[in-house]
Amino acid sequence: MKQKYTCLLYRTKTTEQKDQAEMERQRGVCLQFAQEQGWLPIREFWCSEEDGRPINEDPLLELRAGAEQAQFQILLVSEFDRIGRVPVECSAAAAFFERHGVEVWTVTDGYMGKLVRLEVETMK
């Protein structure tokens, strides 16, 4: 079996979650899940909506570029809403990765591909 390269994304969405403990929680569950699946984490991305970075420095832009270049096969987050700032952004981002051959997985719900395809179809 070919080993799957995996990128891990950790994101805090509110000031309550901004603390280091929340990021470490996400990191811990993602690393454990990746290990259980036999995936090789190659990159970790940390993002806080309150960190003051311009939107064009969002880790999703770098992740998208990596997907376009087929640098990894799995994007893993702790929960689906960590992919974007609002639900429609989460679905659009996940659909982008799926179109570029990257499977989107969450620790809480597993493989999100089928759900993403359903949501994209209903948005048309």
Enumerate the language-model features and the residues they cover:
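Short, structured surface patches at the beginning of a domain
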Residues: M1-K124
